């Protein structure tokens, strides 16, 4: 058998796993791998990011649309440590990515060699699994294991740290390498719990379905729709659950959470049975835990056994994949008329519309509002674009007002709330979905954290539409300081550079929008452009995002103003 280097074995292993794109940044300790990658240019597209954090976020965006792990490769030391924020982000949101980092030679480990960093020790808390390869013979098996772990059970990030000597030494490549299937926890009472869940839902007077990111991760959108239609159940999404059920669906009642819709939050505490599936009851959704859903019998379904009964005790806790569970539960469900109960949600919608929505979506004078920008984008794209939102007020506005009609249409940083996520994530999303319209909605603060990825967009000739909602402030922090810190605005005002000149430097067509009359025509030009386009839209400086559940308050204490 012909011998090949560890770096060549790595490339062969990645090709075996179906890898067609790598986001990366070369350096000393990973150069043998990049040399091997040179021979795979026809099979693997390498995207040269401008910062290693961008590689991790791009891999996340790619994974969200491709439905398979995104892959990033960087060098040792600062290259590897720069990945950590992106890895932690993927861990929080259950995004499967495979990170490969170079490392100093095995003989130099522990000597404080140039660009040595204890990567395995650093990333262990924020990965599903990580491993350091010191021998080329390990490569084939370890890569297979990494992809298996990243995509099985609750998905998430894995990291392979490969020493330089393992990259250069020769080995006999084992092309048949397979990983041992991970043992899953078998619940002997699963069928009994399934029937109990069905009985609770069939007998409920005020049933309520809450769904999260687990629906999209399990590819269970069709099963969710059939289930809620069979039972006539009102259904609400978490932030990351958005687009798993079309917003236009008559049984979709809105978004949960701190800046979610009025009805879904207000009526949580009036439901008598709640089915929570593919969500983990994080603090943005529950509000004050002791006051959460006091009248409800809760059925909690999650792929991660550790999430069950972790925050909110469940009457029935079921460890299951969302797709499998819904497919088995739906035949047991009886259709009932819950129109009176759903009517309560619609009454809340009317109140929210009167107090908040109309003012935000259709301001009659003054500065442009964030909401009207999102409304126009939604109308012009018919709710079918991929919205990649950064973190802050604009994230909540995009979630609330874009009319998602197509699955896998909202990509954002949920659990970690990483500013700077959107621009690099949109790179990965566009490469995974080249035929889909990808629109990055970003705040002026977030944009400046990763704006160097405009260079990646330029070099890769990607068509990404970028909208900066520019309020010259760190808007969400400013809102909290206004509401809860006696208007003591501590370091939230931003003196920004000329974003249009920056876009010019990257050869990206752009416009500055200050006047409402100019907004719609500019959006038309942006959306019809063949390549990338940037709009810097000046929005109201002191605009607040409502509804809002104050920190520490119960969900039914949600405020409209």
Identify the meaning behind each predicted range:
Residues 7-11, 15, 20, 28, ...:
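Active-site diphosphate/adenylate-binding microenvironment
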Residues 8-19, 61-67, 91, 149-154, ...:
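Glycine-rich phosphate/diphosphate-binding loops that line cofactor/substrate pockets in enzymes
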Residues 20-21, 64-75, 80-101, 124-176, ...:
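Structural signature of the thiamine diphosphate
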Residues 31-106, 108-110, 114-115, 263-274, 278-282, 309-311, 396-474, ...:
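Thiamine diphosphate
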Residues 64, 213-299, 405-435, 448-451, ...:
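Glycine-rich, anion-gripping cofactor-binding loops and their flanking helix/strand elements
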Residues 101-142, 241-346:
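Glycine-rich, acidic loop regions that bind phosphate or pyrophosphate groups
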Residues 137, 173-175, 199, 295-391, ...:
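Phosphate/pyrophosphate-binding active-site segments
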């Amino acid at each position: 058998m012909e011998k090949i280097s560890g770096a060549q074995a790595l490339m062969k292993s990645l090709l075996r796993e179906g890898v067609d794109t790598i986001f990366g940044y070369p350096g000393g300790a990973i150069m043998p791998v990049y040399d091997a990658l040179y021979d795979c240019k026809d099979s693997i597209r390498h995207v040269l990011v401008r910062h290693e954090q961008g590689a991790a976020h791009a891999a996340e965006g790619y994974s969200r649309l491709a439905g398979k792990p995104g892959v990033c490769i960087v060098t040792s030391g600062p290259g590897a440590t720069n990945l950590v924020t992106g890895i932690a982000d993927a861990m929080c949101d259950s995004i499967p990515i495979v990170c490969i980092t170079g490392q100093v030679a095995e003989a130099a480990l522990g000597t404080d060699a140039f660009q040595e960093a204890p990567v395995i020790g650093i990333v262990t808390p924020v990965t599903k699994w990580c491993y350091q390869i010191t021998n080329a013979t390990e490569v084939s098996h370890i890569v297979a294991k990494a992809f298996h772990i990243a995509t099985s059970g609750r998905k998430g990030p894995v990291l392979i740290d490969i020493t330089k000597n393992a990259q250069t030494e020769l080995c006999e490549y084992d092309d048949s390498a397979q990983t041992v299937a991970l043992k899953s926890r078998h619940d002997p009472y699963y069928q009994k719990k399934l029937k109990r869940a069905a009985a609770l839902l069939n007998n409920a007077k005020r049933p309520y379905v809450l769904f999260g990111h687990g629906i999209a991760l399990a590819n269970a959108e069709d099963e969710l729709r059939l289930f809620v239609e069979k039972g006539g159940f009102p259904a609400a999404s978490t932030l990351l659950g958005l687009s798993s059920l079309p917003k236009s669906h008559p049984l979709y009642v809105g978004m949960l959470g701190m800046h979610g819709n009025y009805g879904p939050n207000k009526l949580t505490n009036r439901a008598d049975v709640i089915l929570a599936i593919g969500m983990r009851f994080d603090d943005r959704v529950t509000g004050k835990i002791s006051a959460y859903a006091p009248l409800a019998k809760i059925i909690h379904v999650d792929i991660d056994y550790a999430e069950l009964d972790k925050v909110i005790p469940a009457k029935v806790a079921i460890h299951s994949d969302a797709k499998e569970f819904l497919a088995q539960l739906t035949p047991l469900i009886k259709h009932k008329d819950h129109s009176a109960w759903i009517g309560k949600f619609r009454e809340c919608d009317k109140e929210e519309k009167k107090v908040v929505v109309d003012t935000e979506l259709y301001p009659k004078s003054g500065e442009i509002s964030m909401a009207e920008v999102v409304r126009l984008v939604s109308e012009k794209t018919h709710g079918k674009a991929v919205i990649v939102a950064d973190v802050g007020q604009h994230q909540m506005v995009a979630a609330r007002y874009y009319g998602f009609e197509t699955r896998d249409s909202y990509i954002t940083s949920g659990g970690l709330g990483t500013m700077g996520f959107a621009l690099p994530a949109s790179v990965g999303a566009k490469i995974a979905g080249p035929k889909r319209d990808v629109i990055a909605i970003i705040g002026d603060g977030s944009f400046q954290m990763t704006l160097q990825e405009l260079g990646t967009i330029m070099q890769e000739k990607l068509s990404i539409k970028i909208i900066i909602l520019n309020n010259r402030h760190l808007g969400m922090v400013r809102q909290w300081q206004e509401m809860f810190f006696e208007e003591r605005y501590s370091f939230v005002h931003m003196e920004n550079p000329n974003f249009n000149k920056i876009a010019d430097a990257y050869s990206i067509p752009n416009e500055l929008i200050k006047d409402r009359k100019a907004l719609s025509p500019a959006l038309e030009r942006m959306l019809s452009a063949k390549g990338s386009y940037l709009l810097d839209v000046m929005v109201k400086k002191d605009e607040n995002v409502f509804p809002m559940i104050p920190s520490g308050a119960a969900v039914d204490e949600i405020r409209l103003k």
